[in-house]
Amino acid sequence: WEDSEYDLTGMANHILIDPSNYAYIVTRKVSEAGNISILQYILENNIAKNQGRDLMIYPCRWCTGAGASDKNRMVAYVNEKEKVRIDIPVMLGRVMTQPDVQQMAYLTAYAGQIGQVKIMYYETIRYKDGI
C-alpha cells in the first residue's frame, strides 16, 4: 500500500499462503479466552477493512517452499482487472495440412496459445518469504 503512495486501489485485497500456515490460522484461537480464529480476527481487524475494502486470505500449495532457501512464501496482491491479467489459453489445433511427395507423408502444422499472469503495476504485489 505504501509503494502505491497510499492509493486505495493499490491496497492488497488477496493474500496467498501455504496450506499448513492457513490451517494453523483457521484452527487456532486468538487467545485462550478468545472465541474466534486467528483468520477471522485478521479479516475483521485490518487496514483494508477499515478503508472499506474486503481482504481475502486463501491457501495456495505453490507457496510451500517457493521462497528463498525453500521457505514458505506469502503473496499479497490486488486482484482487480486493471492490475492483474492473464491471456486466455487456446487449445492446440490443426491449422494447416499439406502433402509432401518426397517423404510420402502429410505435414501438419499445429498452433495454440498459452498464457501467464501479467502484473500490470508492480506496486500492487509483494512477496514475503519465510512465514
Where are these regions (language model features)?
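Extended, solvent-exposed, turn-rich assembly/linker loops in the middle of proteins
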Residues: 1-36
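Sequence/fold signature of self-assembling virion shell proteins
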Residues: 24-131
